[in-house]
Amino acid sequence: MNSKIDAEVIVIGSGFAGIGAGIELKNAGFSFLILERATEIGGTWRDNQYPGIAVDITSFTYSYSFEQNPKWNHVFAKGKELFLYAHHCVEKYGISNNFIFGVDVEKAYFDENQAIWNIQAKDGRQFKSNIIISATGALTDPKFPEIKGIENFKGDLIHTARWNNTIDLKNKRVAVIGTGATSVQLVPSIAPEVKHLSVFQRTPIWILPKPDTAIPKSVQSLFSRIPFTQQAIRVITDKITETVMVTSVVHYKQVPFLVKAFEQLCLNFLRLQVNKKTTREALTPKYGFGCKRPSFSNNYLATFNR
């Protein structure tokens, strides 16, 4: 290895992308470091610990192809399971010593004369490499809405990306701002325990029924004994996920018949879930399916019957 560099490759971020990159780099024989600003690995599954958090792509697909997990407890794994899976992969593939924690990368520039990347952290530390892999994720820094007077609010302020587990919501008056994918999971999870729940919505979200179920121990045992069975299911879930994402989200304008079919499915589901007509109207999106990210839930819409 060139003595001028700390590693041939430096990966920034220790979520699923960073961990996966590290495993593949080790297999390919590269020297590498993974820089992480937090104190442990996990990415979004480390930072997000709000009630109801779960993956919204099937567990079979939301995992490394080279490290299938036969012990998933649900078709759509809960956040804690995914966090533990990430730790399992790091330990199994022996890359734990490649992480440097507490490194908040501030900037990086490429020295063309030496063909070396110079990476600088906020605390002044510097690292050099031939290659950088950015695995920082897109939504890493939470931000509260800019509401006038919010600094004078006397109650508790919680951001879902930095959930405070020491705050008990039982019998409290709670307001949730936003109706995106996180809210779809959070709202039905906290509704039964709070005294009063207000949900502030700017734009309704298209909701599809979620084909989720617990995976019996007998099926988990089958996956362990005959891995091909789980691999076959992954092929199916991969194709379904790719088809839905590519056709009805990425290229939704090119397949209007499919968009209409999904819209009708969502509207039928809305009618089954919500009793009051005015509430249904308030929860009905005014834009086409795929224009914004849809979500899956079997209990979000029904929560508004309370």
Where are these regions (language model features)?
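Rossmann-like dinucleotide-binding core of oxidoreductases
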Residues: 3-5, 14-16, 20-40, 134-272
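Beta1-alpha1 glycine-rich phosphate/pyrophosphate-binding loop at the start
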Residues: 11, 16-99, 202, 273-278
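Tryptophan-centric aromatic hotspots in well-structured domains and transmembrane helices
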Residues: 16, 45-47, 72, 106-120, ...
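Short beta-strand to alpha-helix junction loop
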Residues: 69-88, 254-262, 288-299
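Feature captures the FAD/FMN-dependent oxidoreductase FAD-binding
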Residues: 74-140
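Short, conserved catalytic or adaptor-binding loops enriched in Gly and charged residues
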Residues: 92-94, 148-152, 301-305
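Alpha/beta-hydrolase fold catalytic core
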Residues: 260-306
